Amino acid sequence: MVLLINYAVSLVSAIVVGAVLGMKLSFDMDSFEGSVLFPTPFVAIGLTALIGYLITLDLVSSIIIGIFASVFSKFTNKIFPGVNNDIN
């Protein structure tokens, strides 16, 4: 039960911080731009599972994971720039 609470806290904090950062709420299927609904919750749940497996989880670390996931999703295009298709 505690693990589910940690997942929920991480998920909610990622969505709230993503909304505060000004990310779009809806996502476009033809775009690689991140939004609050994709990939932010999936990054948060994945990081929570990874940290929970490697290290122990508590509420503070779940909140920190949620904040990190939303900031990572916000700046993904700057961290991993796209490929130019210019052949010239």
Swiss-Prot record:
Domain of life the protein comes from: Archaea
Annotated localization: Cell membrane
One Pfam match: NiFe_hyd_3_EhaA
InterPro entries given in the database record: Prd_NiFe_hyd_3_EhaA (IPR011306)
Keyword Cell membrane: yes
Spans traversing the lipid bilayer: 1-21, 27-47, 49-69
Keywords assigned: Cell membrane, Membrane, Transmembrane, Transmembrane helix
Subunit structure: Putative multisubunit membrane-bound [NiFe]-hydrogenase eha is composed of at least 20 subunits.
Purpose of the protein: One of the integral membrane subunits of multisubunit membrane-bound [NiFe]-hydrogenase eha. Eha is predicted to form large electron transfer complex and might catalyze energy-driven reduction of low-potential redox carriers.
Similarity field: Belongs to the EhaA family.
Record-given protein name: Probable [NiFe]-hydrogenase-type-3 Eha complex membrane subunit A
Gene, per the UniProt record: ehaA
